[in-house]
């Protein structure tokens, strides 16, 4: 009798799971139908709208949560991302603009959001095309061009490449590219390194023209490019270690330490407690800008309370907190949003998803990986992510555009073809790494540091997640009645239950 009851219980749970999975698949199908209905599909690249659902079901991690703004935006952003996957005679690319723009290189390629494309795309199951995309920038983008294309914009390619390989290990690929990453770093030094050791950049080539502290002709030392170059040096050192090249490991480890100290000594404003731009002539620019949060994206600042106080500016409505998201400059700045027409490309205050996603990543790193992290909390992070998700709208329909009015949510380029489906930021990666808290490693360890609380969500699931060649499924279910996997946090690896715990807290699983 006990055996029969056990079998019946197992059948009940199995049928409940199948039913829940079918409901999720139906929900995704409904989302895609709605997205397709709203789109005139002016440009078709590798994956058409009619194939979008099948591609998504085969390739993306499936996600479910009680917050419908976040859930819908998660699928909308994957639906939008696949629009930009494009074949070329020199490999598969990921475009930034869906329609051709004048400042692009061949095949409508632009390097500005390259790092974002790799961080987002690394979670796609069939993602080998991203290696072609990386190789395009390393070996093909500048050929037969009248001006440099790869270095047309600041980049954190080595860091993003390592991030990609933390999800999809390939040490041979890393070894084959290491010397070229070294050469490219040295090229950046020749082009942008100042006598004091910091890097300078025009704001337009940081992807943030008409900024408060920058310009198109001034050689200012910005927190953005210096953080990128620090992150790149750290990544190259780690790649060198992975492929047993101690000489390059020592070189870049030392370089990263030196650059880090230069940033701390030269770009940190002790009085305003913020990382700022150092002017070509003179000291620090007085204004706080969102690029001052980027150092935490790369874990550059030490774990000290003084540095953490910079994050007090994020929830402050006189700082960066606006009704529709994170502003690019502090709102108390007297010249906030006074440059240009207010409808061109101006990063003197308006919301720019490129930096919104960077800021969220920096904040999540601060909360997850720093001990002295009391300036903000997980509720502040959730508010920013929810706001970011909710901002994806125009006329009541899902939309992602170029940049946005911080008070009204108006997309300032309107429904302009160049703005539509603008692929300039991450979103799925924010949900997977920052909110749910999957922290990819170079070794076969699945580490999770959740930053969403049971007060916000009493359930969520993230399934068919490919990580280190394993199929991961994660379920959070307070009552156990949603997924019938048991109460609490349950994790499956290749279909086998590998961990279950009552609370939504940090955990690790060895995948060997």
Mark where each language-model region is.
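Bacterial Sec-dependent N-terminal signal peptides
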Residues: 1-22
């Amino acid at each position: 009798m006990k055996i029969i009851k056990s079998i019946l219980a197992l059948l009940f749970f199995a049928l409940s799971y199948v039913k829940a999975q079918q409901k999720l698949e139906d929900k995704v199908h409904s989302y895609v139908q709605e997205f397709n209905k709203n789109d005139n599909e002016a440009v078709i690249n590798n994956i058409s709208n009619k194939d979008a659902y099948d591609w998504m079901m085969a390739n993306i991690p499936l996600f479910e949560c009680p917050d419908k703004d976040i859930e819908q935006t998660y699928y909308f952003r994957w639906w939008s991302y696949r629009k930009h996957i494009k074949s070329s005679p020199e490999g598969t690319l990921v475009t930034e603009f869906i329609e051709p723009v004048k400042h692009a290189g061949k095949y409508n390629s632009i390097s500005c959001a390259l790092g974002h494309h790799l961080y987002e795309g690394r979670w796609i199951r069939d993602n080998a095309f991203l290696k072609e995309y990386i190789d395009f920038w390393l070996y093909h983008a500048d050929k037969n061009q009248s001006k440099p294309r790869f270095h047309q914009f600041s980049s954190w390619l080595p860091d993003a490449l390592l991030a990609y390989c933390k999800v999809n290990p390939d040490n041979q690929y890393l070894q084959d590219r290491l010397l070229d990453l070294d050469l490219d770093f040295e090229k950046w030094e020749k082009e942008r390194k100042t006598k004091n050791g910091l890097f300078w950049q025009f704001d337009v080539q940081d992807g943030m023209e008409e900024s408060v502290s920058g310009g198109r002709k001034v050689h200012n030392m910005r927190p953005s490019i210096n953080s990128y170059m620090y992150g790149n040096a750290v990544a190259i050192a780690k790649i060198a270690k992975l492929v047993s090249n101690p000489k390059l490991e020592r070189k870049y480890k030392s370089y990263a330490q030196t650059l880090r100290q230069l940033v701390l000594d030269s770009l940190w404003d002790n009085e305003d407690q913020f990382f700022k731009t150092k002017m070509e002539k003179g000291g620090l620019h007085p204004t706080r800008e969102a690029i001052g949060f980027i150092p935490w994206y790369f874990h550059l600042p030490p774990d000290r309370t003084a540095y953490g106080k910079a994050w007090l500016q994020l929830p402050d409505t006189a700082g960066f907190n606006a009704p529709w998201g994170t502003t690019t400059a502090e709102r108390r700045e007297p010249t906030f949003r006074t440059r240009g027409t207010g409808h061109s490309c101006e990063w003197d205050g308006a919301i720019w998803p490129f930096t919104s996603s960077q800021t969220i990543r920096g904040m999540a790193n601060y909360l997850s990986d720093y001990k002295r992290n009391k300036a903000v909390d997980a509720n502040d992070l959730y508010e920013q992510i929810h706001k970011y998700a909710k901002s994806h709208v125009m006329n009541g329909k899902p939309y992602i555009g170029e940049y946005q009015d911080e008070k009204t949510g108006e997309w300032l380029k309107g429904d302009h073809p160049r703005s539509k489906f603008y692929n300039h930021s991450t979103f799925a990666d924010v949900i997977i790494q920052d909110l749910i808290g999957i922290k990819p490693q170079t070794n076969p360890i699945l580490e999770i540091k959740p930053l969403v609380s049971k007060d916000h969500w009493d359930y969520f699931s993230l399934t068919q997640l490919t990580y280190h060649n394993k199929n991961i499924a994660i379920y959070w279910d307070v009552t156990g009645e949603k997924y019938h996997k048991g109460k609490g946090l349950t994790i499956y690896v290749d279909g086998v239950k590998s961990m279950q715990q009552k609370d939504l807290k940090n955990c690790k699983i060895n995948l060997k």
